[in-house]
Regions:
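Helix-loop-helix module between adjacent transmembrane segments
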Residues: 91-93
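DPxDG-like acidic metal-binding loop motif
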Residues: 95-115
């Protein structure tokens, strides 16, 4: 018999997409087991409640969240439960699905254990679990995007401080963005950790091109913020172009001939700018398209293996409830 059921959902991206969601469901159990299920991956792991949960490549995110929350928030006392998750975006999509899963699992545990932890703490915990406990390389923006939701300008500091500044983007600007953005899933799964490692190694090696590229990406974030607030779509297009060129210069693995072919086809059909989401290398591509050219670009993209999606933004971050 299940005694308690907690459900949680969240969206991701720096401006989270409402069509890309991750869910976590916790059910407490009478039988002395811990069961992890990832329904989108058709994966399941069951362990006796008194057995250690070792990270071995099988549902490690689930295990790491359970271990951390039990150790630090339940005085080490194991709980018999089933933790089930699924995500609309596939792993390697570039939309931060892994980070979002960690965030929603933490939020679900916080609801289960009645923990008074705020959004900053949840995002910080998610970053620690994914980057330290699971030793997965990456940044911090995905965890904060999924936790807070909405349009934000994020500032990260060397001492692990983060400041999340909500942006009051006018509704007409959001509507125009939704009408102008086209998402295309390339079907190419990529290891973001490898690309991020390449970028980090280039910077540590003193590569001038890599350093300039990283500064360029930071600079375009500031430009994009101002353009969003003003509704300067010409500026958004140019910032998107410059940001993509800077990202490609940060590491050779960010792009490849197939992605460039897709990009060129979309531009030829009328798109004004484009980029690969996340670290790069595959996953989702995003294009800025004048609404009157939208169908032309979609037809051009459909010549490639992949999936076209619309773009809708959400104002909400993770949410949890009981039934």
């Amino acid at each position: 018999m299940c005694r308690r059921i907690v459900m949680c959902m969240g969206a991701t991206c720096s401006t989270p997409l409402s069509t890309v969601n991750a869910y976590a469901v916790i059910k407490t159990l009478d039988e002395p087991v811990v069961r992890f299920v990832a329904t989108d991956q058709q994966a399941e792991k069951v362990k006796a409640i008194d057995e250690p949960l070792v990270l071995n490549g099988k549902l490690d995110l689930h295990k790491a969240v359970y271990n951390h929350m039990i150790r630090h928030y339940n005085v080490g006392k194991a709980i018999a439960l089933e933790l089930s998750t699924f995500c609309d975006a596939p792993a390697g999509s570039g939309l931060g699905s892994s980070s979002t899963l960690v965030v929603v699992m933490i939020r679900a545990f916080a609801e289960l254990l009645n923990l008074p932890i705020d959004d900053y703490t949840i995002a910080h915990l998610a970053h620690k679990i994914e980057r330290v406990d699971c030793d997965l390389q990456g940044g911090r923006q995905d965890q904060y995007s999924a936790t807070f939701g909405g349009f934000n300008f994020m500032e990260f500091y060397a001492d692990e401080r983060a400041v999340i500044n909500p942006l009051r983007v006018k509704n007409w600007i959001i509507c125009e963005l939704e009408a102008s953005l086209v998402l295309f899933y390339t079907g190419i799964s990529r290891e973001s950790a490898k690309i991020i490692a390449d970028q980090s190694n280039n910077v540590r090696a003193g590569s001038v091109a890599a350093m300039e590229a990283m500064h360029g990406i930071k600079r375009e974030a500031l430009v994009m913020k101002e353009c969003l607030l003003r509704g300067d779509f010409g500026g958004i297009v140019e910032s998107m172009r410059q940001g993509w060129e800077s990202k490609k210069r940060s590491a050779k693995t960010v792009s490849n001939p197939h992605l460039e072919e897709i990009y060129d086809a979309a531009i030829s059909a009328g798109a004004l700018a484009g980029k690969v989401s996340g670290a790069g290398g595959g996953g989702f591509m995003m294009f800025f398209v004048p609404p009157e050219k939208r169908m032309d670009v979609i037809r051009a993209l459909k010549r490639f293996e992949g999936q076209v999606s619309n773009c809708h933004f959400t104002k909400h971050g993770t949410q949890a409830w009981r039934i």
